[in-house]
Curated annotation (Swiss-Prot):
This is Olfactory receptor 4F15. PANTHER family: OLFACTORY RECEPTOR (PTHR48002). The chain crosses the membrane at residues 26-49, 58-79, 101-120, 140-158, 196-219, 236-258, 270-289. Residues 50-57, 121-139, 220-235, 290-312 are cytoplasmic. Belongs to the G-protein coupled receptor 1 family. It holds the Pfam family 7tm_4. The gene is OR4F15. Keywords: Cell membrane, Disulfide bond, G-protein coupled receptor, Glycoprotein, Membrane, Olfaction, Receptor, Sensory transduction, Transducer, Transmembrane, Transmembrane helix. It comes from Homo sapiens (Human).
C-alpha cells in the first residue's frame, strides 16, 4: 500500500452510547464517579504497599503493579468518553485511534501475564511455603514484571504492524465511544477478512489460553492443599477467592467478545463500559475488603497520617 491511501481519512467519528440528553447526563455522572473511584482506589493500594513495610512482599509488589496497570487501562478510553458525552461531533484522529488501540492491547496483554504471575505467587506461598522467599525473590518479581510488559508490547505490535498501512478512504464512523481493532479493520477500503481472523485468533488465544492456564493452576493449588491437609482447604479457598474473582471480572468480557459468534454493537459497548469503569473499580475493592493485611495496613497508614497532620 502506498502512503497516500490511508491519509484520505484524517479522523474517525464516534456515534457514542446514546442521543438522549437524560441518559447522557446519567452516563456522565456514572462515568465520572466510577473513573474517580477507580483511580483513587488503585492509588490507595499503590500508596499503601509503597509506604507500609509490612507489605513489602512479592504478593503485594505484584498487586501494586496490577493497580498501576488498571489505572493506565481505564485512562485509555474513560477520560475521552467523559469529555465527549455531550458533544455532537465526537472525533478522534487517525494517530489517536491507533494509539488508543495500541495501549489497550499492550496493557491488556500485560495484565493477563501479570495475573498468571500472581497465580504462581499464590501457588508457591500455599504449596511450597519453605521455598517461597527463595524462589519469589525481588529479581524474580522484576522478571515477571518485565516479561509481562514485553509480552503485552509484542501482542499489541504484532496486530498493529499490519494495520497502520491499510487504506482508509471512508466511511469513518465508529458505532462506539472508543477505537477497537475489529471495527477499525471493517472501515478499511480493502479486504481484511484474513487480518480480522488473525486478530481474533491472536487476542482470542491469548485470552482463552491465559484463562485456562489460570483455572488449571487454581485447581492444582486446591487439589494439593486438599491432598495434604483437608483443614487447610478452607484457608486456601479464602486466600484464592479474591484472585479468582479478579480473574473472572477481567477475562469474562474478553472471552465473551472473542468467542461469541456475532456480538451486537450494544453488547460490545456494555462490555467496553464494564472493562473501562467497573473492573478497575472493583479490583481495589476486592483486594482491600477481602484482605486483612491490607485493611490493617490502611488503618495503620491513616493513623500515621492523622498523627502527622496534628504535628503540623
Amino acid at each position: 500500500m502506498n502512503g497516500m491511501n490511508h491519509s484520505v481519512v484524517s479522523e474517525f467519528v464516534f456515534m457514542g452510547l446514546t442521543n438522549s440528553r437524560e441518559i447522557q447526563l446519567l452516563l456522565f455522572v456514572f462515568s465520572l464517579l466510577f473513573y474517580f473511584a477507580s483511580m483513587m482506589g488503585n492509588l490507595v493500594i499503590v500508596f499503601t504497599v509503597t509506604m507500609d513495610a509490612h507489605l513489602h512482599s512479592p504478593m503485594y509488589f505484584l498487586l501494586a503493579n496490577l493497580s498501576i496497570i488498571d489505572m493506565a487501562f481505564c485512562s485509555i478510553t474513560a477520560p475521552k468518553m467523559i469529555c465527549d458525552i455531550f458533544k455532537k461531533h465526537k472525533a478522534i484522529s487517525f494517530r489517536g485511534c491507533i494509539t488508543q488501540i495500541f495501549f489497550s492491547h499492550a496493557l491488556g496483554g500485560t495484565e493477563m501475564v501479570l495475573l498468571i504471575a500472581m497465580a504462581f505467587d499464590r501457588y508457591m506461598a500455599i504449596c511450597k511455603p519453605l521455598h517461597y522467599l527463595t524462589i519469589m525473590s525481588p529479581r524474580m518479581c522484576l522478571y515477571f514484571l518485565a516479561t509481562s510488559s514485553i509480552i503485552g508490547l509484542i501482542h499489541s505490535l504484532v496486530q498493529l504492524v499490519f494495520v497502520v498501512d491499510l487504506p482508509f478512504c471512508g466511511p469513518n464512523i465508529f458505532d462506539s465511544f472508543y477505537c477497537d481493532l475489529p471495527r477499525l479493520l471493517r472501515l478499511a477500503c480493502t479486504n481484511t477478512q484474513e487480518l480480522e481472523f488473525m486478530v481474533t485468533v491472536n487476542s482470542g488465544l491469548i485470552s482463552v489460553g491465559s484463562f485456562v492456564l489460570l483455572v488449571i493452576s487454581y485447581i492444582f493449588i486446591l487439589f494439593t492443599v486438599w491432598k495434604h491437609s483437608s483443614g487447610g482447604l478452607a484457608k486456601a479457598l479464602s486466600t484464592l477467592s479474591a484472585h479468582v474473582t479478579v480473574v473472572i471480572l477481567f477475562f469474562g468480557p474478553l472471552m465473551f467478545f472473542y468467542t461469541w459468534p456475532s456480538p451486537t454493537s450494544h453488547l460490545d459497548k456494555y462490555l467496553a463500559i464494564f472493562d473501562a469503569f467497573i473492573t478497575p473499580f472493583l479490583n481495589p475493592v476486592i483486594y482491600t475488603f477481602r484482605n486483612k493485611d491490607m485493611k490493617v495496613a490502611m488503618r495503620r497508614l491513616c493513623s500515621r497520617l492523622a498523627h502527622f497532620t496534628k504535628i503540623l
